[in-house]
Amino acid sequence: MFTYKDVIFEGTQPQIDEKVYFAKGARIVGRVTIGEYSSIWHNVVLRGDVNSISIGRYTNIQDNSVVHVADNYSTKIGDFVTVGHNATVHACTVEDHCLIGMGSVVLDGAVIGRGSI
């Protein structure tokens, strides 16, 4: 049904709503949860290997972006969020209704507040 390649990491498989869209080349590894009607675009990497990634509903992660975690920080992306092309979202929190611009880098421990651009 999906067009993505999911990878089990240390016995943990991604949990993905059936209404999520995956473009060709997207890669999902480990402890990743994605809410309904979200979209993961071409060549995105979601790497929940050493901690977890949670992506809310109606969120889109655009082409060539990377979402990763750290040992001491998970990554949480809320509902109705856009992560622009070529962005890196690493071990941080992005609250609901945010826009992370193309090429942006958000690093460990950062909190992007609700409605931020």
Each language-model region and where it sits:
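Terminal amphipathic alpha-helical/low-complexity segments used for targeting or macromolecular assembly
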Residues: M1-K19, G25, R31
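Left-handed beta-helix
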Residues: E18, A23-K24, V29-G30, G35-E36, ...
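Phosphate/pyrophosphate-binding betaalpha-module
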Residues: S52
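Catalytic donor-sugar/metal-binding loop of nucleotide-sugar-dependent glycosyltransferases
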Residues: Y73
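Conserved, surface-exposed functional patches that form binding/active-site neighborhoods
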Residues: I117
